[in-house]
């Protein structure tokens, strides 16, 4: 069967079985829901296609994993490279490739600030997808009250605008640093990447969660363009 049928008849039921979109706070973002990782770009003469993940699994306000789907007649290994690419772009630790019959799980590992692996990357075949709670525990083994508060606070979507993937990564990275009590944070973004919008969303989440009821000093959220 083709990929659309494979997803509808084989992959979707496997996700529902373990609680996705059944457990409160769990969301499956798909191409049909217009989940676009990166918009298309004009490159010389031709226009490149936008990058769209087949599935992005979100729970408690955070994107936790990507699933690259292939039709059931194709070997599951053909989706692995794309699954890894999307995981790197979205900064999710876990990613999967599936043809509906088999599921290949990839743990992208954890790196320190210098890019050295703290937890090595691993791959293996699994019999099912993790539940929302399991995937959350895999991603965040230790509880962290402020991180969870920041995650659960929705972005300000006045005007119907959503953060692009790199803006969301920047917002989450800054808020993780705040949650970990890092005293000074420097956010460096290139010209034209939405520095003001990104800084606004950071401040929005800080104020809405009550992290600082007085004010956020600009020195604590240094935003510099390159």
Language model segments and positions:
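ATP-dependent helicase/translocase motor core
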Residues: 1-65, 70-214
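Short, basic, low-complexity termini and linkers enriched in Ser/Thr/Gly/Pro
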Residues: 216-226
């Amino acid at each position: 069967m083709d990929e659309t049928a494979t997803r509808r008849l084989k992959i979707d039921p496997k996700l529902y079985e373990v609680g996705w979109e059944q457990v409160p706070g769990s969301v499956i973002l798909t191409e049909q829901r217009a989940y676009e990782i990166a918009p298309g770009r004009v490159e010389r003469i031709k226009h490149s296609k936008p990058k769209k993940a087949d599935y992005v699994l979100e729970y408690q306000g955070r994107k936790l994993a990507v699933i690259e789907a292939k039709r059931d007649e194709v070997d599951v290994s053909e989706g692995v490279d794309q699954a890894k690419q999307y995981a790197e772009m979205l900064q999710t630790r876990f990613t999967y490739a599936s043809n509906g019959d088999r599921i290949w799980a990839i743990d992208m590992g954890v790196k320190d600030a210098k890019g050295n692996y703290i937890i090595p990357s691993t791959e293996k075949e699994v019999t099912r997808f993790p539940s929302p709670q399991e995937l959350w525990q895999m991603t965040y083994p230790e509880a962290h009250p402020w991180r969870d508060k920041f995650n659960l606070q929705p972005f300000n979507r006045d005007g119907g605008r959503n953060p692009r993937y790199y803006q969301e990564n920047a917002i989450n990275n800054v808020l993780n640093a705040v949650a970990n009590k890092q005293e000074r944070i420097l956010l460096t973004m290139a010209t034209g990447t939405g520095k003001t919008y990104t800084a606004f969303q950071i401040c929005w989440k800080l104020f809405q969660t009550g992290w600082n009821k007085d004010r956020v000093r600009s020195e604590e959220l240094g935003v510099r363009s390159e």
